Amino acid sequence: MRIIRAKDYKDMSRKAANIISAQVILKPDSVLGLATGSSPIGTYEQLVKWYEKGDLDFADVTTVNLDEYYGMKPENDQSYHYFMHDHFFDHVNIDPSRINLPNGMEPDEKKESARYDAVLRSVGDVDIQLLGIGRNGHIGFNEPDDCFAKGTHCVELTESTIEANKRFFASEDEVPRRAYSMGIHTIMTAKKVLVVASGEDKAWAIRESCFGPVTPKVPGSILQLHNDAIVIADEAALSLCGDFL
C-alpha cells in the first residue's frame, strides 16, 4: 500500500485525477470503478475540466459503480445514479451504454446481486477502482462485519453510516437503511485501487485501514493485501498516522 500525502482536499482531488487521467490516456478503453459521496467530487470536477479543455476523451471508457441505495429511484436527487450524472457523466462524452450501476429499484436482492455480478464479469477487469472510505472503515457499502463479503449483496447500513448520511436528507426518516454494494472480492480484483480521504473525521479509518490488523471489522484494512493500492489523504485524514509515516 502506497500513501500519498496531500495538503488539502483540492490537492488530494488533483492528485487522484492525475492518476485516473493517465490511465485513460494510456488505455482509452479503460474500465473505471467509480465511487460516490463527498470524497471523490473534487476528483470528478478536475476530470471534467480536463475533458472540457480537450485533454481527455471518455468515449471508449466503461464505468462500474460501487453501490446504490435499495429502493431509491434513479431520478431521486440523492440516488447514486443522479449523483454520478450530476457530477460526472453528464459533463463528459461517455457512452451511456457503457455506464453500469446497481439497480436500487429491484426488490429481489438475489436477482439484482446476480445481475450486477454478471455485469461486472462481462466488462472484464477494472483498471482503476476509485474508493472513498467511511468513518467506520467501510468501502463501498461493505460495512464492518464478521466476514468479508465476496460478491454484490444488499447490506444493512450501520448507525454510523446512517448518521453520516443524514446531512444529505431533509429528515432522518428519509435516510436509506439498506443499499446494494459491490463485494470486497470484486473490489480486490481491480488492477489498481485508489482511495481518497480528507478531513479529521476519516483519520481513525485511515489509520486502522492502513496500519491496523486486517479484519472485516475494518473493511478498508483488506486493501493492505492488494498489490497496487494507493491512498491519497490530506493532512487532517493522516493526523493519527504520525507514528507510522
Where are these regions (language model features)?
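ATP/nucleoside-binding phosphotransfer catalytic cores, i.e., glycine-rich phosphate-binding loops
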Residues: 185, 189-245
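A glycine- and small-aliphatic-rich helix-loop capping segment at beta-alpha/alpha-beta transitions
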Residues: 46-57, 80, 144-153
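Glycine-rich N-terminal segment of FAD-binding domains in flavoprotein oxidoreductases
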Residues: 26-52
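N-terminal glycine-/serine-/threonine-rich phosphate-binding loop
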Residues: 1-32
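Glycine-rich phosphate-binding loop
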Residues: 124-149
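Class I SAM-dependent methyltransferase SAM-binding "motif I" and its flanking Rossmann-like core
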Residues: 140-184
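Short beta-strand segments
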Residues: 33-37, 65, 102-103, 130-133, ...
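Ligand-binding beta-strand-loop-alpha-helix segment within the catalytic cores
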Residues: 56-129
